Amino acid sequence: MSKLAKVCAVFLPIGFVFSVVGGIIMSISESPDFDGSTDYEVAYTTMTYDDEYNEECDDGSAITYSSNEADSIVLNCKAATINLFKCEKYLVNTDELDSNDLSVTNSDGTLNVNYSKEAIEDTDGDPLSIGIPKSCKNITIKCNAGDITIDEFMGNTIEISVDCGNIEISNSTVSDSCVINNTLGNAYFYGSDITGLNADMVSGNISIYSTMLSGSNKLNVDVGNAYLTFKGYPSDYTINANVKVGEIECDYDLSENTYSDDKIDISILAGNCSIDFYNEYNE
């Protein structure tokens, strides 16, 4: 059985499956219009890391580690609404967490956070807010269910695997690789510079706005739409887009540039794809 068949059998009622595949209709959550327009305003700038920290960095009820105790964080959870934000230290906010289900350890420079509590019906799981310092260079998240937000991260790698939930990465710089595996849910990237994005979406939309992709990048969607506004110009990228059932909307001749080292392969089984570019002429 293919992974698309599996997710349809597990997550989606039969009637909804036919409406999605037959009409290429995605209603998992709010998305931009097909023309790629969004409500987001992101400055066309190079990312820098300043020392202004989120107010959530207040120790309060939190487990903390100094910034020099680890350079990586690994997060495993059954269900939680996860928020990773910039902080001067590693901080796990415990205000709304069940301490019996929470484990935080530091091993060989890796902070391991495990939260085993199941989600209550009609909820997204407990809020799991984690502060990460600029010394943190690698983020790994594995979660059964829940939304994941990463803001103002500057490091080497991000690896996220989620069965059901949305993923949002904003105002971040990833220098080596960013791997996203999402079975049911959407993925959003805003105002970021990412090298080596590999996004595999089974059922959900992928939205990219004012984000520079460098190196080799792959965007795979089984059922869903791709709303793509890359930072820069068409000449900055070599783009190969393939849609089996659906439409590709782009005002530029993508075949003109085949020499850029920054390559983007887009593959959609059933869905639409819009491609645009964000630069000083249209900011």
What are these language model-derived features?
Residues 110, 116-119, 167-182, 186-283:
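Short, surface-exposed interaction patches in beta-rich subdomains
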Residues 7-10, 45, 248:
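Short amphipathic alpha-helical "recognition" segments used for binding
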Residues 25-116, 123, 127-140, 147-161, ...:
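Short linear S-[DN]-x-LW-Φ motif typified by the pepsin-like aspartic protease active-site region
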Residues 1-6:
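Positively charged n-region of N-terminal signal peptides that target proteins for export
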